[in-house]
C-alpha cells in the first residue's frame, strides 16, 4: 500500500558518534527521534532510530565492521481511511550490517556492506515475507585533510535494495566540497546540503533529502476489496538544520523542515 502526504512539518533530534577512518561509510553510533505531523490533520508519523557499528581493525587501514540498526515507526492515523489502520500502527525495521573497508591505494578507499533486513509489523512469527537483503560497494576519494585550497570528498558506488522493486544495482554518488573556511556543499542522494560554519562547534545547514520506509504487513489489510500485504511511504524533505560538535566525534543535530 502506498500513501502520499503533503504539507508535513518535520523535526529531528539525534546524536551521532563517528570514527574518522570509517565515517565515510557509516556512523559508529546514532540515536535519533523524528516526528512528522500531517498538515491540517491529526495524523502523525513518529520514528525512533538506534544504530551501533563495531569496527575490528584487521590490518593497517583495513576494518571489518559488524553492526545493527533498529527503526520503530509509529503511525497515529486519526483521519478516515477506506481500510483498517490498526495493523499499521507500529512498524519495525531491523538491519544487521556486515562491512569491510580498506585503502585501495594512496587516494582511494574501497568499502562493501551487506545488510540483511527484517521489515515488518511483527504481529506474528517472522517469515520469509519479512526478510529483505540490501548491500552496496563504494569507492571513496577523501581529500578533506589534504593541504589544498578546497578540500573535497567523492563517493562512487552501487547499491542493491530488494524493497525498491528493481532487480539490479542502482548507482550512488556523493560529492562534498569545502568552498572556504565558512562554507561547504554536499551533493548526492538521499541528501544534499549547504553548510555554514560559525566556528568549530556550531554550524547551520540548508538541506533537501529523501526519506521513507517499506514493510510487510503480517496481518494484511484490505483496500477497495483488494488484499494489501505491504506498506510504503516516500517523502521529499527540505529544511534547515543546526549541528553542535561536542568533540571531533560526537555531534548533536536538530533539523526542521517540510515536505
Predicted regions and their residues:
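Short glycine/proline- and aromatic-enriched beta-strand/turn motifs that initiate or cap beta-hairpins
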Residues: 23-80
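Membrane-embedded beta-strand positions of outer-membrane beta-barrel proteins
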Residues: 29-31, 64-68, 112-114, 154-156, ...
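Transmembrane beta-strands of outer-membrane beta-barrel pores
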Residues: 33-39, 68-76, 102, 116-122, ...
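Residues that define the transmembrane beta-barrel architecture of outer-membrane proteins
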Residues: 44-48, 88-94, 127-135, 167-171, ...
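Residues on the lipid-exposed face of transmembrane beta-strands in outer-membrane beta-barrel proteins
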Residues: 50-54, 96-102, 135-141, 158, ...
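Repeated loop/turn-to-beta-strand initiation elements of outer-membrane beta-barrel proteins
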Residues: 58-65, 107-110, 144-154, 182-185, ...
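Outer-membrane beta-barrel translocator/channel fold
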Residues: 68-94, 102, 190-259
Amino acid at each position: 500500500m502506498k500513501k502520499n502526504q503533503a504539507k508535513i512539518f518535520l523535526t529531528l533530534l539525534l546524536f551521532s558518534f563517528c570514527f574518522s577512518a570509517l565515517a565515510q561509510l557509516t556512523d559508529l553510533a546514532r540515536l535519533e527521534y523524528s516526528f512528522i505531523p500531517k498538515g491540517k490533520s491529526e495524523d502523525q508519523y513518529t520514528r525512533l532510530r538506534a544504530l551501533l557499528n563495531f569496527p575490528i581493525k584487521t590490518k593497517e587501514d583495513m576494518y571489518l565492521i559488524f553492526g545493527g540498526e533498529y527503526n520503530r515507526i509509529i503511525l497515529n492515523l486519526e483521519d478516515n481511511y477506506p481500510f483498517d489502520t490498526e495493523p499499521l500502527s507500529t512498524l519495525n525495521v531491523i538491519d544487521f550490517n556486515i562491512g569491510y573497508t580498506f585503502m585501495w591505494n594512496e587516494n582511494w578507499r574501497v568499502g562493501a556492506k551487506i545488510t540483511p533486513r527484517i521489515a515488518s509489523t511483527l504481529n506474528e512469527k517472522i517469515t520469509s515475507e519479512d526478510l529483505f537483503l540490501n548491500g552496496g560497494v563504494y569507492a571513496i576519494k577523501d581529500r578533506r585533510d589534504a593541504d589544498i585550497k578546497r578540500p573535497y570528498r567523492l563517493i562512487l558506488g552501487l547499491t542493491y535494495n530488494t524493497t525498491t522493486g528493481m532487480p539490479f544495482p542502482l548507482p550512488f554518488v556523493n560529492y562534498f566540497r569545502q568552498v572556504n573556511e565558512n562554507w561547504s556543499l554536499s551533493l548526492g542522494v538521499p541528501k544534499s546540503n549547504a553548510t555554514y560554519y560559525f566556528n568549530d562547534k556550531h554550524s547551520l545547514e540548508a538541506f533537501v533529502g529523501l526519506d521513507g520506509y517499506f514493510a510487510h504487513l503480517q496481518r494484511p489489510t484490505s483496500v477497495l476489496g483488494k488484499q494489501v500485504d505491504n506498506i510504503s511511504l516516500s517523502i521529499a524533505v527540505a529544511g534547515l538544520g543546526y549541528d553542535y560538535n561536542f568533540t571531533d566525534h560526537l555531534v548533536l543535530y536538530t533539523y526542521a523542515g517540510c515536505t
